[in-house]
Regions:
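Loop-helix junctions at membrane interfaces
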Residues: 1-157
Length: 157
């Protein structure tokens, strides 16, 4: 059920006409929240499955510009979820380290892809590099915070 909800939230951008930057930060935060909640309620294996499905659906929705970026996003999502698991006992590290590590990994890997493909358009290169770094950091951080708020409210029920 959590995987279906995450994929539905990711598809909101197809029906909700938001400007691209707003869509990126809103949908990205919700998707990261769902990665965290899936890990929390269904375990690491299910969260890793979701981590692999999300970039595929994003590509099919036209949100990933190059197919070679799918493994970059896979790697970032997997690292994010695994670090959540490893640092779950330390709330501060779990809040900051997974988003930071994901953003760094994706930024470096996207740089490699962009240079291997040798995109001729500098604006496209910058767009890809930005999208694979700063928004990942911000939306992952917000997603963890949102997931904690949801988790605390569910625990009160």
């Amino acid at each position: 059920m959590l995987i279906a909800l995450a994929l539905a939230l990711q598809a909101v951008r197809l029906v909700l006409p938001l400007p691209q930057p707003v869509s990126t930060f809103v949908i990205g935060s919700l998707v990261h929240m769902m990665l965290v909640l899936t890990w929390r309620f269904s375990g690491l294996g299910t969260a890793l499955l979701l981590a692999l499905l999300l970039p595929l659906t994003a590509y099919l929705q036209g949100q990933v510009l190059l197919p070679l970026l799918i493994p970059v996003i896979w790697a970032g999502n997997v690292l994010f979820v695994v670090l959540l698991q490893l640092f779950s006992a330390n709330h501060r590290l779990a809040l900051f380290l997974p988003p930071l590590a994901k953003a760094v990994l994706m930024g470096v890997a996207a740089w490699c892809v962009v240079n291997i493909v040798a995109l001729p358009n500098p604006a496209l290169r910058k767009t890809i590099m930005f999208g694979m770094s700063v928004p990942q950091l911000v939306t992952a951080f917000i997603g963890i915070w949102l997931a904690r708020q949801v988790f605390l409210r569910i625990r009160k029920l």
